Amino acid sequence: VENYDVDGIHFDYIRYPDNRGRFPDDGMYRLHGKGKSRADWRRDNITRFVTKVYDRVKEVKPWVQVSSAPLGRYRALNGVGGGWTALETVFQDAGHWMRTGKHDALYPMMYYKEQLFYPFVDDWVAQGNQRIVVPGLGVYQMIELGWSRQDILDQVDHTREHEVHGQAY
C-alpha cells in the first residue's frame, strides 16, 4: 500500500485448512491459547491479523478497500444443510470483521444452489453491517455438475431482491 498505487487488498485464502485436526499448531496453542478453546484461539489469530492489516492500510491510504472471499456458508443455520462453514470449520469470522468495521467488502464463495444458497446469502447480508456483500456464484457448476442456466438466473434474481450488492463470477 505504501509502495504501489492499489485500490484494494483482497484476502482470498484467509483461513485454516480444512484438515484442521492435523494442522500442526499444538505447540503454539499450548503457549498462546490462554484458556481459550482451540477454535476460538484460531478465529482470534485470523481476526487479529485481519485487524492489523485493515488498520495499517487505512492509516496509510484510507480509500483503499479491504476485502476477502470467505467460504459460502458463514455459520451453521438451524435445519439447513451441513458441512463446511467459515466460522466453525476454517475459523473465518468474517461476520465479526464486517460488524466491527475491519472489512469493507465480502465476496463469499457461494458455489451452492437452492437450500444451500438462499438462506446463506441472506445470512451474509444480515452479518454485513450494511457493507458490501457480493456473493461469488458457481457458474462453473453448469459444466461440472450440470446446473441449469435457470439455477444461476434464480440466484441473480434473489440477490437483486434481497439488498445484495451484486454478484461475482
What are these regions (language model features)?
Residues 5, 62, 129-131, 163-164:
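Short glycine/proline-enriched coil/turn segments at helix->beta-strand junctions
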Residues 5, 30, 55, 112-113, ...:
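Compositionally biased, intrinsically disordered low-complexity regions enriched in proline and serine
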Residues 37, 125-128, 160-163:
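Generic secondary-structure transition motif, activating predominantly at the C-termini of alpha-helices
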Residues 34-41, 111-120, 128-131:
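Generic structural signal for short, solvent-exposed loop/turn connectors between secondary structure elements
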Residues 94-117, 131-169:
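Substrate-binding cleft of secreted/luminal carbohydrate-active enzymes
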Residues 33, 63-82, 121-155:
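Active-site clefts of carbohydrate-active enzymes
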Residues 1-103:
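Polysaccharide-binding and catalytic clefts of secreted carbohydrate-active enzymes
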